[in-house]
């Protein structure tokens, strides 16, 4: 057991370091190339997203979704376990300082997610049924002109859908329901399988309609509950912020040199959890944004900036403050149970049930969203209906199995798959960054604030 534990810890160290060097590096580079536009053109970003929320563009194609539905579906895959369970895991593994690095990484992630969405819309095409399809596999194929890398990404995407989009989600939901209501893990797993199985036939249009209603409501309720906790614990907040920044930039970490600092535990865990939360650089969100009804790749890319802000900058920070305001991290509670306990200590016993139901709802939406990503990856590789059916059966089986796996094993698997999926996507974004920069510059020339 010790050798297995040692191997897992070593794997986490390697994956964490790779996340920092690859994703943070790409995010910083693109932020500079795009002249920090999420900050400089902040007003335009929000005006062209939420300001146009009820404006419906001309139909982009059969089976497409609105820009907001695309964003809601992408957020369904990120909000929930990454914000509720992932933050708790980050605090236990990397300490309060990890939260600061989640926030820092989220700023640079905005440019990265913007870039991959722009490319997804620019290189999208229509399938045999007249549906818009896009994503990294298409800009790898037609932009980088590497069908091999496109196929590799598709294989990795289909594989990752079983980790971040499946095992981690069902595990979080099952753990939360058991902690709050004593529901056995297999029961929650079976209910999740039934829900996902019944909705498989709806396709992207149905998923978009569900998520555009469920995600805003659940996120709003969760933020209101979090605000109540923080108001009741307001006197603790100054000390919490001091602790977070002190541990994020500790002298001990800095003494290891710049490289030692960058691969220190708080930075590793913060960036890795931040990526799990907002998925910037992974290439998942571009798959659904590539099907959005839009006449502008840049405007659709703005939604990626908003996603990162809402998901990591806002939701993750709020969750971290709630957990830290409730007590220390040295107990036996982990993941969803730790977050639920934090709400319960301040708001009372019923709060734990609320958190658990929230996690289940978010997890179910995430599983649906990632099933779409996985199916599109499989569809890119083969037109075989049998292959798609095999994927769906395997996906449903994984939902059930994930509910009963250990929390540590699930996160280790998810992080590794996230990294493998991100490598070809980030490489493509960097190779095609001139396309993104040109589109961004031309857009702001035509639409001056």
Residue ranges and their predicted role:
Residues 36-65, 89-91, 95-99, 111-144, ...:
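Flexible loop linkers connecting adjacent transmembrane helices
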Residues 3, 33-38, 82-87, 163-174, ...:
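Transmembrane helix-loop junctions in multi-pass membrane proteins
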Residues 1-77, 81, 92-98, 109, ...:
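N-terminal alpha-helical transmembrane segments of multi-pass membrane transport
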């Amino acid at each position: 057991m010790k050798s297995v534990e040692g191997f897992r810890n070593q794997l986490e160290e390697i994956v964490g370091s790779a996340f920092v060097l690859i994703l943070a590096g790409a995010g910083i580079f693109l932020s500079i190339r795009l002249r920090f536009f999420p900050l400089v053109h902040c007003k335009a970003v929000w005006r062209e997203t939420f300001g146009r929320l009820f404006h419906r563009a001309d139909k982009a194609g059969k089976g497409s979704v609105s820009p907001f539905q695309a964003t809601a579906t992408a957020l369904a895959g990120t909000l929930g376990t990454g914000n509720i369970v992932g933050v708790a895991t980050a605090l236990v593994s990397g300490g309060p300082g990890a939260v600061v690095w989640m926030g820092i990484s989220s700023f640079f992630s905005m440019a990265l997610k913007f870039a991959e969405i722009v490319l997804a819309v620019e290189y999208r095409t229509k399938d045999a049924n007249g549906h818009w399809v896009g994503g990294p596999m298409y800009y790898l194929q037609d932009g980088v002109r590497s069908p091999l890398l496109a196929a590799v990404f598709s294989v990795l995407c289909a594989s990752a859908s079983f980790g971040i989009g499946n095992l981690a989600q069902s595990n979080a939901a099952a753990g939360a329901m058991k902690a709050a209501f004593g529901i056995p893990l297999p029961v929650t797993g079976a209910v999740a399988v039934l829900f996902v199985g019944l909705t498989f036939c709806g396709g992207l249009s149905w998923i978009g309609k569900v998520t555009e209603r469920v995600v805003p409501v659940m996120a709003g309720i969760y933020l209101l509950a979090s605000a109540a906790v923080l108001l009741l614990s307001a006197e603790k907040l100054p000390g919490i912020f001091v602790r977070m920044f002190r541990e994020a930039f500790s002298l001990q970490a800095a003494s290891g040199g710049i490289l030692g600092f960058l691969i220190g535990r708080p930075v590793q865990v913060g960036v890795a959890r931040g990526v799990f939360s907002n998925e910037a650089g992974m290439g998942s969100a571009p798959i659904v944004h590539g099907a959005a009804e839009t006449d502008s790749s840049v405007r659709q890319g703005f939604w990626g900036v908003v996603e990162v802000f809402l998901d990591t900058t806002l939701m993750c920070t709020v969750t971290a403050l709630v957990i830290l305001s409730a007590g220390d991290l040295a107990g036996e509670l982990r993941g969803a149970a730790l977050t639920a306990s934090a709400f319960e200590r301040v708001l009372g016993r019923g709060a734990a049930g609320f958190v658990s139901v929230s996690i289940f709802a978010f997890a179910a939406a995430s599983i649906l969203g990632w099933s779409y990503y996985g199916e599109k990856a499989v569809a890119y590789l083969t037109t075989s209906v049998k292959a798609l059916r095999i994927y769906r059966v395997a996906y449903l089986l994984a939902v059930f199995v994930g509910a009963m796996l250990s929390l540590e094993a699930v996160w280790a698997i998810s992080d590794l798959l996230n990294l493998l999926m991100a490598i070809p996507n980030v490489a493509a974004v960097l190779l095609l960054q001139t396309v993104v920069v040109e589109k961004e510059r031309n857009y702001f020339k035509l639409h001056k604030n």
